[in-house]
Amino acid sequence: MSIAPRMAARSWRLSSSRGYSSLAIAFDIDGVLKQGPKVLPEAIRTIRMLEGDNPWNRKVPYLFITNSGGKSEAVRAKDLSNDFQTHVAADQVVQAHTVMRSLTEKYRDSPILMLGGPDYPPGSSRGVLESYGFRQVYTAHDLHAYATSSFPYTRPGKDQEPALRRVDFSKVQFEAIFVFHDSREWGRDIQYAVDLMRADRGVFGTVLTNEEIRRRSPMPIYFSHADLLWGNDFSVARLGQGQGAFRVALEAVFKVRRSG
């Protein structure tokens, strides 16, 4: 793939005509610098040029923007450092859920349901939101362990037990749902999102009448990105959480339940 070198060539012409102080570069990662786990050789050469291996021996500021996620910016920066054979700082990384930091002030002390993100290591996805400053983060694993019949098709994984928050959810009033990253269990996560959007005062296991639901605004739900598709090393693009995939599936189920 030749995207990276073409980008670099344009960048050097820009820097020579406008000066270094006005130039910075933002890279996408998936499909541009990497193809699945494979780092493109052109990408490594481009990063080296930005690090000063260029005719002017000058560094050019750059950052990475990706709709990937599921780990902290610091961990992602370490991974990218290994990939591109240079030091990448955490503040050079903007992931799908980095934007959720902007909601910290509003929901810092509010109970929120986090959906999606890697299940391993257990509790790691919750830890990312907590590192942003959210203090009451609950997961689908927590709800499933609290009431196994709420999603009877699978059992809560024993490997998740050390990371579970075991609380009485009849006393928790959820205020928002965060789709942190791509769901690993669409059926369960759609079920719980619809449950909370139809719940009385955000209490899991309660339900308003359809008339009350139609009169009220549903619980806020925030998606970390809007991708329908994303690419990896498989030959066909994969469905994401955004427009047309998980979100549309959730909206369709909620619409049917609200009108029923």
Q: Model segments located where?
A:
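HAD-like aspartate-dependent phosphatase fold
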Residues: S2-G260
